[in-house]
Design a protein with these regions (language model features):
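PLP-dependent aminotransferase class I/II
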Residues: 3-164
């Protein structure tokens, strides 16, 4: 019972990005709520900084054919909690960025239809090829508001250099 409860509270899995049951992220306690309340006045400024960083990345990487940047519809104003690219040779790029001191992450490396918690739906590998392809191509770049323009430019330069 304890193991199942822990899984339910951690998105449904004991291991990150591998879900055995459908769960939630329900770890907000009073202390975290107080901290978030204190940060709320800064949210608009932080969101604008993230949008600026995203625009810088997108502009710098626009002519790199191996990189697909996020598509932003003109009527939307994303916050860019993550800035996720789809790239060729993702694992090699990830290692390259790490070797250059650039943090990066692969969120959701296993598509939903291949998670254990959805196995009863009967989807097999190959059934949703675009989702599987995306899971193998996505990489997220640093996007936190405190980044400097020089740091964002450095990350973009490291990616451009990798694909030359």
């Amino acid at each position: 019972m304890l193991f199942r409860s822990r899984k339910l509270r951690l998105h449904g899995g004991a291991k990150q990005y591998h879900h055995d049951v459908v769960g939630t992220n329900s770890r907000l306690d009073s202390m975290q709520a107080a901290v978030l309340l204190a940060k709320l006045p800064y949210l608009a400024t932080w969101s604008e900084r993230r949008r600026e960083h995203a625009a810088t990345y997108s502009n710098a990487l626009a002519d790199v054919s191996e990189v697909r940047t996020p598509v932003v519809d003109a009527c939307n104003e994303p916050i860019f909690h993550q800035y996720t690219l789809r790239v060729e040779r993702r694992d090699d790029l990830q290692a390259h960025l790490k070797s250059k001191g650039v943090g990066n992450a692969v969120y959701y490396p296993v598509p939903l239809h291949l998670q254990n918690c959805f196995s009863d739906l009967g989807y097999k590998r190959g059934r949703l090829p675009e989702a599987e392809r995306a899971a193998g191509e996505v990489i997220s770049l640093p996007i936190y508001p405190e980044l400097t323009r020089d740091q964002v430019d450095y990350v973009a330069d490291m990616i451009r250099g990798f694909y030359r």
